[in-house]
C-alpha cells in the first residue's frame, strides 16, 4: 500500500504549469510553480514545518507548548497544520487589512486569531510585530516563530523549493520571479539556483509602500517609501533577515490596482485560482517583458489559493468601490478571439488552390508568404475580377495578381489604430505575436468587437 503517515508528508512536489494567454506578449516560456497543491494551499507550508522542526531540535519548542506568530495568513495555516499533528497550541496575529477568509480559515483549523491595526509603525506597540513579541513574553511555555528573521524559513526553500524547480526545468531555468515578503522564498530558492548556475536571474516583485526596491538599489532605508497599501502577502516596512539582497538581481514594483486587476484574470484566463501576490507577479512580468527573450525559461511562483480572497479581489463590488476596474481601451490582443492556425498562401501557389482554401475555411482574404516573409495578400474580389477577365486561368500562380501585404501591428496596438488600418482597400491587419507567429484581424472581428 502507498500512503502518507500524516498530512505534513504531502508538502512539496508542486507542479509547474505553462501559462498560455496572460503572458502571450512575453517571448519566453513562462511556467508557474503552483504552490496551492500543498495541504495548506500555500508555499508557506514548507517553511512552517521546517521552522517548527528546527525549533524542536534546538529545544526552543517543548511538548504542549504554544506557537505564536505574526502572519498574513498563509504561514499561520502551515503552522496550524503542523501544530495539529504535533500537539501544539497556536496563536496567530494578523493585521486588519488581511482578508476575512484568511482569519476564518485559521480559526477553522484551531488557531486563536488576534487582529491588529495595519496603519501603524512597525515598532508601535499595536503593530502585529510588537503584539506577537508581547504575547510570546506573556504566554508560558511559548515560542515566537518570527518568520521574518528565522533563517529556517529560507533554508526550507533552499532544501525543497529550489531543487524542485531545478529538476522540473532540467536545469534550463533562466529567470525566477516571485513576490517578496519575508524574503524566505526568493532567498532560499535564489541561493540554490545561483549555486547551480550563477547566470540565472532572480527577480523580486515589490509593491508601492514597501522599502525593498529602493534599499536594494541604493542601500538606503527610506521611511518616505513607507505608506499603506492594499496588496497582500508582499512588500514590507522592515528589512527581514531572510531577505538576501545580494542574491536578488532586480526588484520590480507593481501598483495595488495592477495587481488587483490581474489577480482574477489568472483564474479566468488560465484556470489557475490563486491569490493577490500571483496577480502582482504576472503584472510585474508584463511590465518587464523586454527583459525576456525567446528561448528563456521563466519560472514564476504562485504563493497561495484564491479562496483566501473571494471577498476582495474576486468580488466585483469590492473592486469597483476602489476603482480597480480595467480601462476599456482594448488592444489587438483582445481582438484575437481564437488560437487556431493562420491560413496562408504561398506566392507560387495556384489560384485554384487558394480558392479551395477560402472555401474550406470560409474566409475571404489570405496573407501571402514567400518563405517566412509576408509579400502580399489575396482576396476573393481580386480572384473574381481576374477570373472574369481571364477564364480558364485557375492554374496560374497568385504572385502576378496579389495585392500589397496587409499592414502589421503588434499585440499592444490599440483598437482605435487597428480600426484605422482596416479600410475598403485593406480588409485585414496582421498581428505579430511574441513567439514570432502571426494572427489576422479582419473587418468581421472589428464588427463583433463593437456590436
Per-range role (PLM):
Residues 1-331:
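PLP-dependent amino-acid enzyme catalytic core
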Residues 380-399, 446-451:
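A short, polar/charged loop-to-alpha-helix boundary motif
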Residues 364, 376-383, 438-446:
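Short hydrophobic beta-strand motif reused across regulatory alpha/beta modules
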Residues 47, 51, 336-338, 358, ...:
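Methionine-biased hydrophobic packing positions in alpha-helices, especially
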Residues 60, 373, 436-437:
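Residue-level signal for well-ordered, solvent-exposed loop/turn and beta-edge residues enriched
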Residues 247, 328-342, 395-406:
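Bateman (tandem CBS) regulatory domains
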Residues 343-362, 369-370, 387, 408-427, ...:
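The conserved cystathionine-beta-synthase
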